[in-house]
Amino acid sequence: MDTFITKNFQTTIIQKAKNTMAEFSEDPELQPAVLFNICVHLEVCYVISDMNFLDEEGKTYTALEGQGKEQNLRPQYEVIEGMPRNIAWMVQRSLAQEHGIETPRYLADLFDYKTKRFIEVGITKGLADDYFWKKKEKLGNSMELMIFSYNQDYSLSDESSLDEEGKGRVLSRLTELQAELSLKNLWQVLIGEEEIEKGIDFKLGQTISKLRNISVPAGFSNFEGMRSYIDNIDPKGAIERNLARMSPLVSVTPKKLKWEDLRPIGPHIYNHELPEVPYNAFLLMSDELGLANMTEGKSKKPKTLAKECLERYSTLRDQTDPILIMKSEKANENFLWRLWRDCVNTISNEETGNELQKTNYAKWATGDGLTYQKIMKEVAIDDETMYQEEPKIPNKCRVAAWVQAEMNLLSTLTSKRALDLPEIGPDVAPVEHVGSERRKYFVNEINYCKASTVMMKYVLFHTSLLNESNASMGKYKVIPITNRVVNEKGESFDMLYGLAVKGQSHLRGDTDVVTVVTFEFSSTDPRVDSGKWPKYTVFKIGSLFVSGREKPVYLYCRVNGTNKIQMKWGMEARRCLLQSMQQMEAIVDQESSIQGYDMTKACFKGDRVNNPKTFSIGTQEGKLVKGSFGKALRVIFTKCLMHYVFGNAQLEGFSAESRRLLLLIQALKDRKGPWVFDLEGMYFGVEECISNNPWVIQSAYWFNEWLGIEKEGSKVLESIDEIMDE
């Protein structure tokens, strides 16, 4: 029965039916016949509503008669069935009050705007007349009745309420369902709607009425007063309730979508008067510089690891006369430098732990004592100087070249690997051999990808940060930013990318913020792309000789903050691997099913029959750039990492809203002729998410490029079609 229901009814109808059952604590899996009855009942209500319309003067039209006049028509019937029970009652009372009629004692299924009458719809396995009189006895004249039977008969209290076509459609659908059920031997197990209705009607006496009035919560004098308050309150269901009331006034005109109707999103990202989007990731990525120290591969305490790395690069460790290269707007460079020196001294001193003294500059950097003071509501009301702070709307920014550069650098191969994955036991079943082979190819490609090194740095740092935040809530702690890499020869190196300072971390809630000051090494001169670094204060602290060449070393300092949720996600950053690998594995599986054998090796390297697979991985000078299967895997993995690193509400909103546009473009490509309404509203929903998130702005830029290419392609196809027609 479950499969039958899924196959024969729309998903929205099934979901509403399940919600209705949930309100009565009924289980759809245990009572599939009840679920079926509710689905049929809902569908009949929608069929009746979809077939009948009214114009502004109240004249009735069928769906066929109303073609071409859709702008001036509205549904004749309001569908109440399928709404959550409390909202349905609110809508029913509102409609009764609006049209000056008495509210029925029972919930109706439909409301007729022409006759201003509520309607009960019934479906029965027996005779329609028998069920009609059962309903009539229960409901009296409080509402009209529309009863339909699987036996191809019907009974209406008002014959003019439904035309012949409407009756025919309902009865045809019931016949079709009965035939399908009989074919699958399910007809006999189905119980009729009339058999599951159980109820006892009784008159509300004076005693019970008094008890009801006494039982209302404090603040209400009687039951009717409480009901009136509930009807007018603005709870979470306010949107649904108001929409239900507005439905007769709403006119939606679908329009067939053409390529010309689609425009680029976020035009402000090309506005050169706006500032470039700044770098705001928690840690440096492609600009990082790790101080390497060869190790035997044994595990070490973070402090020991950092101390050994600093000892190897003593000129950087002992630097006391830095050169200020760049200063962020609110930074105090003297305080930041003194805090850095305290961090170095703490790490270098074997006798102390990694706790910092609470100096005035440490308090400034960690924001100690700058938290908002909570004021009780009663006090705030009496104080005229107290007011609600205006919400801060993010400033709009334009696209910056550094985002694409980060993407390119992170998806390249390096000579070191940092990926730390658990070992898997030996294969047992044949399918495990395929899995191991596939995993080997995937991991080899990802292992030496720059993005995997950055990912592991995030994982290790957030793990240490969360541990310290929980273990030392009232202390300032130095946390080394470290990683361990292995080169192609199998030699292990400890890497120190910088140091961080954790402020006080009494994190009661998941969103409570802990201040983190980061000090990171880099060989990138910030003046080369100054628009990227407005959030950083940068010092030049010396130089290193790499391959016989002197490279300057800069210290990037930033006051930042995070919370438990973000730290937990940082610890789980390895999930980025899953999404990218699953995406590529789906392609391998598809190829394997076509060829009839495992195509893992063929996709990566090719075989005697097939060349290695290639994919479009970007554009260059307006043309698509192809890349190998492995390169495509690394690009998708890097995108997953960037999605995590720059993830916020803007990105969530953009991903959800832009998906609709992508589906429309795909439908146009497939020549399915999509219809839309309120396209500008969809664009508004997308564009309000494009503010100052680097990944969102870059994604919008890529979307516009892709849209341009698809539009050009559609013109070529149209010209080919014209030639073929001639």
Swiss-Prot record:
Biological process according to GO: cap snatching; DNA-templated transcription; symbiont-mediated suppression of host gene expression; symbiont-mediated suppression of host mRNA transcription via inhibition of RNA polymerase II activity; viral RNA genome replication; viral translational frameshifting
Signal peptide feature range: none
Modified how: Phosphorylated on serines and threonines by host kinases, including human casein kinase II.
Extent of motif Nuclear localization signal 1 (NLS1): 125-140
Keyword Transcription regulation in annotation: no
Major subcellular location class: host cell
Enzyme nomenclature, EC number: 3.1.-.-
Cofactor(s) needed by this chain: Mn(2+)
Keyword Plastid among record annotations: no
Top-level class of the enzyme under EC nomenclature: hydrolase
Cofactor note text: Binds 2 manganese ions per subunit.
One Gene Ontology MF term: RNA binding
Subcellular locations according to the entry: Host cytoplasm; Host nucleus
Record-listed Mn(2+) 2 binding positions: E81, D109
Family according to the record: Belongs to the influenza viruses PA family.
HAMAP family attached to this UniProt entry: INFV_PA
Function: Plays an essential role in viral RNA transcription and replication by forming the heterotrimeric polymerase complex together with PB1 and PB2 subunits. The complex transcribes viral mRNAs by using a unique mechanism called cap-snatching. It consists in the hijacking and cleavage of host capped pre-mRNAs. These short capped RNAs are then used as primers for viral mRNAs. The PB2 subunit is responsible for the binding of the 5' cap of cellular pre-mRNAs which are subsequently cleaved after 10-13 nucleotides by the PA subunit that carries the endonuclease activity.
Subunit structure: Influenza RNA polymerase is composed of three subunits: PB1, PB2 and PA. Interacts (via C-terminus) with PB1 (via N-terminus).
Name under which the protein is recorded: Polymerase acidic protein
Gene responsible for this protein: PA
